[in-house]
A protein has these predicted regions:
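Structural signal for hydrophobic packing residues in well-ordered secondary-structure cores
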Residues: 6, 20, 24-27, 70-81, ...
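Short alpha-helical segments and helix-capping/turn motifs at coil-helix boundaries
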Residues: 63-72, 122, 146-151, 206-210, ...
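Conserved acidic/glycine
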Residues: 1-116, 259-261, 265-267, 278, ...
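General beta-strand structural signal in soluble alpha/beta enzymes
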Residues: 83-84, 113, 136-137, 163-165, ...
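Thiamine diphosphate
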Residues: 1, 88-186, 204-207, 214-319
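Short coil/turn connectors at secondary-structure junctions
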Residues: 76-80, 105-109, 130-134, 156-162, ...
């Protein structure tokens, strides 16, 4: 019985290749798009669709900024699909106007995974392995624990799945301590080949999505805030390159020397900038470093890391 499986598979593959050849001859434009999607290449000039945020824009949570990025990218990246573990409104991951996926509507791009984070993670892995799609899945950061085995397998297999984990701090509203992630962020950073990015504001969030979509050798986790954060003037021209490097000098010391380095991620970056101003009043020169991704920073050349964090500046504070 087993010996017949090989020839059956060969016949099925030959039939599929004949159908593909016929399709390519009949639908040339669609066939080129199919080849692109199956190869994992992103559409040309897709980066131009990334939104840019201004410092005078009203403060917004990075989960809201992420939703705006998805709204901008969905029309230009047709293979971008995803959903949430029954938390799409809260995680801002619903693609408006693109319908829901079901057996009757396979063209829908929104997936309702249900309250089953581990199942969602496993489904994302299967979608990525099958090919032709770029899936993301969302839940609260605290619930990443429920999908950890699926995340670890994605990292082991080098699958470029994207996780959107929101409500990343104690500012989680009325839900209380059961929804406050404490140890989750550090434990996720320990998973080999999982790129964790915790952006400081809207522009860093857009840059984080760029990194996630261009990363092909493993999963990426976007860790986002529930509470509103200011749109920092310092990130407008620096975020795209800075986030890709994992850490960068966001604001140099206003004095002619650096007495201390303040290192922060996510919602604490704005606090670091305020601390820099207070220290300046005391004639203490503070450099502020935004470090959204430890693993990406670790991959940088030594000269870059030493430029951001010089060894002779021994006073450092991580917030």
């Amino acid at each position: 019985a087993y010996r017949t499986a090989g020839p059956q598979g060969e016949r099925a593959e030959a039939l599929w290749r004949d159908q593909l050849t016929s399709y390519e001859q009949t639908y040339r434009e669609e066939a080129r798009e199919l080849r692109r999607v199956l190869s994992g290449r992103l559409p040309e000039n897709w980066v131009t669709a990334l939104p840019r945020f201004k410092p005078d824009d009203k403060p917004m949570a990075t989960r809201v900024a992420s939703g705006k990025v998805l709204e901008s990218l969905a029309p230009v990246i047709p293979e971008l699909v995803g959903g949430a573990a029954d938390l799409a409104p809260s995680t801002r991951t619903y693609l408006s106007g693109f319908g829901d996926f079901s057996r009757e509507t396979p063209q829908g791009r929104n997936y309702h995974f249900g309250i089953r984070e581990h199942g969602m993670g496993a489904i994302l892995n299967g979608m990525m392995l099958y090919g032709g799609l770029r899936p993301y899945g969302a839940t609260f950061l605290i619930f990443s624990d429920y999908m950890r085995p699926s995340v670890r397998l994605a990292a082991l297999m080098g699958l470029p799945v994207i996780y959107v984990w929101t409500h990343d701090s104690i500012f989680v509203g009325e839900d209380g301590p059961t929804h406050e992630p404490i140890e989750q962020l550090m434990s996720l950073r320990l998973i080999p080949n999982l790129t964790v990015i915790r952006p400081a504001d809207a522009n860093e969030t857009a840059a984080a999505w760029k990194v996630a979509l261009e990363h092909r050798s493993g999963p990426t986790a976007l860790v986002l805030s529930r509470q509103n954060l200011p749109n920092l003037s310092e990130t407008v021209d620096r975020a795209l390159e800075g986030v890709a490097r994992g850490a960068y000098v966001l604001s140099e010391s206003p004095l002619d020397r650096v007495d201390i380095i303040l290192i922060a991620t996510g919602s604490e970056v704005a606090d670091a900038l305020e601390a820099q101003k207070l220290l300046h009043k005391q004639r203490i020169g503070a450099r502020v470093v935004s470090a959204p991704s430890w693993s990406l920073f670790d991959e940088q050349p030594l000269f870059y890391k030493l430029n951001v964090l010089p060894t002779h500046i021994i006073k450092r504070l991580a917030i």
